[in-house]
Design a protein with these regions (language model features):
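Surface-exposed acidic, glycine-flexible loop patches that form ligand/cofactor-binding
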Residues: 5, 36-38
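Short, structured coil segments at secondary-structure junctions
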Residues: 40, 57-59, 130
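Helix-rich interaction surfaces within compact, conserved domain-sized segments
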Residues: 145-191
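Conserved P-loop NTPase motor cores
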Residues: 11-36, 49-52, 62-159
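Conserved catalytic segments around the Walker B and adjacent sensor/switch elements
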Residues: 40-47
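A structural signal for isolated positions on well-ordered beta-strands in alpha/beta enzyme cores
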Residues: 45, 109-111, 176
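Pre-Walker A adenine-sensing motif
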Residues: 1-8
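Conserved P-loop NTPase motor module
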Residues: 10-14, 171-223
Length: 223
């Protein structure tokens, strides 16, 4: 796997998190028109909350207001976008089935757009643990989320992800991308600039050296 053949895999889900006006929806629109999926989607279903569909008309999406009881009628090889439906979906069992079962059985790609990475319910935690890709947008008002993720991913070097996030999100509307798929090499888990128009892609790696009486320590380096 290299930066030249990077693709998003079918049968996966993505969590896009950040505050209002961070650039989440714009990122998803650009993602959906890019050529970085490893299959050709048959349909794009966009589920939204509230009464507004501003910016969604004319893009070829199949628009749905609110959440259905289940997603059994979504055809295979489709993309499903859940746009800021965290309140409606907090305890929605059908939504959890989408993340844990249907996404794999139907080779779907599910994108969950939310303002809060950590939502306090059993259902949302199950969905989060079954998410393969994470996009964290710059959030000056809450840096604790990236601290917690960093401690979970790199318990031996908990400040690594925090430092990387500062580097990746220096500019407004910037983001950090995490690839949590089982088969992804460790050196390619943390990136930014993944969209084709943003290339060159940036990859953030830990470099391990033997120092201090032979103990292996993690040294931060950005590539």
């Amino acid at each position: 796997m290299t930066i030249f053949n990077f693709t998003l895999k079918g049968g996966s889900s993505m969590l896009v998190s950040g505050p209002t006006m961070a650039g989440k929806s714009t990122f998803v629109h650009k993602l959906l028109t890019s050529k970085i999926f490893d299959w050709q989607p048959t349909n794009i279903y966009w589920y939204y909350g509230g009464d507004t569909i501003e910016g969604l008309d004319g893009r070829g999406y199949i628009l749905r207001q609110g959440l259905p009881d289940n997603f059994l009628d979504v055809p295979p090889n489709s993309i499903v976008v859940l746009d800021d439906l965290m309140n409606e979906g907090k305890d929605h069992a059908g939504l959890t089935d989408l993340f844990t079962k249907l996404v794999h059985h139907k080779n779907l790609f599910v994108i969950n757009i939310t303002q809060n990475f950590f939502q306090n319910s059993k259902e949302t935690r199950t969905r989060r643990l079954n998410t393969q890709y994470v996009v964290m947008f710059k959030n000056p008002s809450d840096v604790t989320q990236i601290h917690i993720i960093g401690r979970q991913m790199y318990p031996g070097n908990p400040t690594f992800l925090t430092s990387v996030n500062k580097n990746a999100t220096k500019k407004p509307h910037s983001y950090l991308f995490l690839d949590l798929r089982q088969e992804t090499p460790e050196d390619y888990r943390v990136r930014s600039h993944i969209l084709p128009h943003e290339f060159p892609m940036r990859i953030y790696k830990q470099v391990l050296d033997y120092i201090h009486y032979g103990k292996r320590q993690a040294i931060r380096k950005f590539h």
